Amino acid sequence: MNIDIKLHKYDLPEDLDLGNIIAVDGEFMGLNVKRDPLCLIQISSGKSDAHIIQLDRSNYNAPNLNKLLSNGKIVKIFHYGRADMAHIKYYLKTETNNILDTKIASKLARSYSDSHSL
């Protein structure tokens, strides 16, 4: 399987269509939101693609990324997204809408187990 990896500097292209369900993951320097900066966001439509957005840490101006994350018509899948969403809200100044967190879903569906990763 070949994965199409795209590196985007500072923001997504305006005309990028990833469909109505995407996976999202953030990378930051630590878990303290006010101290540890958000460095990049990874997004995939699940169709052998990976879009890596290297954020401009001097201003975090990423209007196309913000538009995607706040779009309530697009499902954003996270795994244990609490820290991701806290960093996104703090640095990108946007609310992430229509979220599915796989760790929470696992806890709801598999209440007999304590093993849900992370």
Identify the residue ranges that each predicted region occupies.
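Conserved RNase H-like, two-metal-ion catalytic cores of nucleic-acid enzymes
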Residues: M1-S117
